[in-house]
Regions:
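Proteins that catalyze or organize thiol-disulfide redox chemistry
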Residues: 1-65, 70-95, 103-106, 110, ...
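Conserved residues in the N-terminal Rossmann fold of short-chain dehydrogenase/reductase
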Residues: 98
Length: 150
């Protein structure tokens, strides 16, 4: 797959569909069953929970950046708009997920989240990097590029 395409799983039949990035706004349909495909990862961060974490993060066809956050956390609020911007910039190449650690303690405990924000970088179903704290945007972009190229 080249960087001008992404893969979207069909919610009906689970078939994996290769979609050109420049056609994501055309409401693509599944090639197998014809069902409408969900919006591609990357338009905006997706909320994940204890129940959906493995499916959304570890089963993703794209690398995933997970923002472990809480609503009362100042640095978490500061990095939120940066992650929204990066979600648009890396659309179709990187999925950005947000895990509210207050509402999802099981997943937070599983990954040893003790400070927030904590960013988890997952690629090919494996945790490949972790960042504790809210890095500046340029440092975060460098880290994302390293993960994408690895």
């Amino acid at each position: 797959m080249n960087v001008s395409q992404t893969i979207i799983a069909c919610p009906q039949c689970r078939a994996r569909n290769r979609v050109a990035l420049n056609r994501l706004d055309e409401r693509p349909r599944c090639g197998k069953c014809g069902a409408a495909l969900p919006p591609a990862a990357g338009d905006r961060p997706v909320a994940v929970s204890d129940a959906t974490f493995d499916r959304e993060v570890f089963a993703s066809s794209l690398p995933v950046l997970v923002d472990c956050w809480a609503p009362w956390c100042g640095p978490c609020k500061a990095i939120g708009p940066v992650l929204d911007e990066l979600a648009r910039a890396y659309r179709g190449r990187l999925k950005i997920a947000k895990l509210n650690v207050d509402d999802n303690p099981r997943t937070a405990a599983t990954y040893g989240i003790r400070s927030i924000p904590t960013l988890l970088f997952v690629k090919n179903g494996q945790l490949v990097d972790t960042q504790v704290g809210a890095p500046p945007k340029n440092a975060l972009v460098q880290r994302i590029e390293q993960v994408l190229l690895s």
